[in-house]
Amino acid sequence: VGILALYYAHGKLTGDYTFDLLKLYEGNYAYHLQWWVFLSFFLGFAIKVPIFPFHTWLPDAHVEAPTAGSVILAGILLKMGTYAFLRFNLPLLPSASITFTPFILILAVIGIIYGAFLALAQQDIKKLVAYSSVSHLGFVMAGIFALNQQSIDGSILQMVNHGITTGALFLIVGMIYERRH
């Protein structure tokens, strides 16, 4: 819905109806449009990240997935949501990004703490690593929405670190599962 709204808004501004991202970046969209498009993008991207409280699917997905699926999910796919915030929300919707920053920072901090405490309480190793991912991606989101270049660079580095280490952790967990069952 948000993508279609940008398509029509860009067409009304310039007469050129397009989905070309580089052309969409050039649009100076009204604040109320940015607000609604940001909200629609946020919902989809927050589920993909997963940011608290949209994280509930992740532990079950890791438990049910084979080892290779967990490695791909943790190592690559979770970062697609954070990348989408960097690629779409910040440059396309700058005013709405600033408006939503306090809300997202609060969710990120809650996710950091909540994910860490839930990870500590887990008996299943896959769930432990999954909840630690919720916590780590909270740090990434907090860095992205600190809205300065240094924090965004740190978030990108954390995404790479998380992809490598969590992927490796799921490989180790997979080896443990293979030997125990």
Language-model features, listed with the residues they occupy:
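Hydrophobic transmembrane alpha-helices and their helix-loop junctions in integral membrane proteins
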Residues: 1-181
